[in-house]
Amino acid sequence: LAAADKKANRIAAEGAIAIATVGDATAMVEVNAETDFVAKNEKFVTFANTIAEIAAKENPADLEALMAMEYPGFGGTVEDKRKDMILVIGENINVRRFARMEGACSSYIHDKGRIGVIVKFTEPASCGKFVAMQVASMAPKYLDRTQVPAEDVEKETEIIVAQIKNDPKNANKPENIIKERMVPGKLEKFYAANCLVDQEYFIDDSKTVGKFVASEGSARIVEFVRYERGEGIQKREDNFAAEVASMIK
């Protein structure tokens, strides 16, 4: 295990997103490795899928609780199995995060685990897979505009006002015209880009996602979660020239 601990500080920003459904629960987990090559390893893929199944079945309170759960057929915990995987594969491996939802959920994995999405509906939705694909491709931040924090709207408004005032064409525009007529239209574009139900549907841009879902039946979107592999993790930058230079000194 000391060998596994030595690798703990190495950056692991590759890996895969895995999703599993057990009963009426769907869980998604991000498991990171150091290289894309290892992320395609069959043992690594099985490890990620098994953890997603454990999360769906056992409903752990948090990541620490998930790591303390028994890993089936191993004789140890998920954390024990993680350390064993490091020794077997030879790279740092981290279980970074997980999400779990119960009820009528649809899910989607894009590009062999690069992006994963779970969308929960009020009831089973025939359009669920398409909505999950929308979330994967268009990366909305919010479900609808009621979920956008007031400070985000305020910040966006400040940016819009600054952009308008910096445009020479608007040099003589009165303040009230800018705020009452120009800002609202640009805020609508912000909502259309960031709120799932207001986004243009990626298959038919003549309708929003909200209108598409409404046209498909009585199911409505309750919430969604989107993971992208390695997002927010500082990637290791290999400087090949410097590496070669250091070898010949």
Task: Name each region found by the language model.
Residues L1-K249:
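N-terminal assembly/interaction segments in proteins that build large macromolecular machines
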